[in-house]
């Protein structure tokens, strides 16, 4: 009996240690979630009031697109074309930009008439997942399970960019995946492991090609920094990075190619870069916007939102 009690004690201690190791990651998910819920309560967002989180394009565009999407999924209609857009239009381009996120398929669980509420929940979920993935990156990158990773995960999830753009629900998947992609490229270079990099980058490209373009630009710059740190195997690292980046892009091509063809036939085909370089804003004033306690810019001069 004494032996059994000792074994049980060891098992309980092991479980306790495993639970403690998970606490920072769990906190990185739950703290942004709790703060988001408190904000909803304070602003009387349903079910705590009669308001909703939908604003601007989220209300006038994204919600109708989501409604069309769930109707197609439940009725078995084709995702290639829609008869509810004007006199009829392709649905592929809308799906590729607005609806391709894997999380959006959970809308099948949403009762009819609650699409707005589903989108609000999805927004909060993505904010919370940002905290989790960034904390996970810090844990693996610095080989630590310090509680501080939950703090920095929360800071990432509730950053100024998320505060300003969380309502653009089709963008935030890439923000969730970005820390995992960065961890993946580190593993690709340092450990010759490609699975995480390929899967996360391909998923990001499929989810939203617009933000993925910015992620890819960052990846090239970050890869060059990692390459400088490598003392050997640089050629192999370059080959792996190029190959798996192209492979991820090729995976995303199932949506990128139709999207490019459709955009080429739309009014966007005549758009080109300016022939001359010109400053449209004060650079010092723009840099000043990065400081704390400055007045939030709400004008319509279309200054670049740099974070």
How does the language model describe each region?
Residues 1-5, 208, 288:
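Short intrinsically disordered, low-complexity coil segments enriched in acidic
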Residues 17-29, 46-53, 206-242, 289-306:
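Alpha-helical transmembrane segments and their immediate interhelical/interface regions
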Residues 32, 36, 123-141, 147-228, ...:
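Membrane-embedded helix bundles of polyisoprenyl
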Residues 42-142, 147-179, 203, 207, ...:
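Active-site lumenal/periplasmic loops and adjacent helix-entry segments of GT-C-fold
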Residues 44-49, 112, 191, 227-234, ...:
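Transmembrane helix-loop junctions in multipass membrane proteins, especially transporters and channels
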Residues 56, 60-71, 96, 102, ...:
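Periplasmic/ER-lumenal interhelical loops and adjacent helix-loop junctions
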């Amino acid at each position: 009996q004494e032996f059994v009690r000792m074994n049980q004690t060891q098992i309980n201690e092991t479980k306790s240690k495993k639970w403690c190791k998970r606490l920072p990651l769990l906190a990185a998910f739950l703290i942004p979630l709790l703060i988001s819920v408190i904000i909803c309560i304070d602003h009387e967002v349903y079910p705590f009031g009669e308001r909703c989180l939908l604003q601007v394009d989220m209300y006038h565009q994204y919600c109708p697109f989501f409604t069309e999407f769930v109707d197609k999924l439940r009725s078995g209609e084709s995702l290639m074309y829609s008869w509810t857009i004007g006199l009829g239009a392709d649905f592929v381009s809308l799906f590729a930009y607005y609806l391709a996120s894997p999380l959006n398929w959970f809308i099948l669980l949403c009762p009819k008439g609650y699409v707005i509420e589903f989108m609000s929940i999805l927004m909060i979920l993505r904010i919370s997942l940002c905290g989790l993935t960034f904390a996970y990156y810090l844990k693996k990158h610095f080989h630590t399970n310090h509680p501080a990773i939950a703090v920095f995960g929360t800071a990432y999830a509730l950053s100024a960019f998320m505060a300003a753009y969380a309502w653009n629900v089709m963008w935030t998947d890439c923000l969730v995946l970005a820390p995992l992609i960065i961890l993946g490229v580190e593993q690709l270079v340092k450990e010759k492991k490609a699975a995480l990099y390929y899967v996360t980058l391909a998923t990001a490209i499929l989810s939203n090609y617009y933000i993925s373009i910015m992620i890819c630009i960052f990846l090239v710059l970050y890869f060059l920094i990692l390459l400088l740190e490598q003392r050997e195997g640089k050629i192999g690292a370059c080959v792996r990075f190029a190959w798996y980046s192209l492979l991820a892009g090729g995976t995303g091509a199932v949506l990128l190619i139709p999207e490019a063809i459709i955009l080429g036939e739309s009014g966007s085909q005549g758009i080109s870069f300016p022939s001359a370089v010109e400053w449209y804003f004060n650079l010092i004033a723009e840099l000043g916007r990065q400081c704390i306690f400055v007045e939030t810019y709400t004008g319509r001069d279309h200054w670049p939102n740099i974070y």
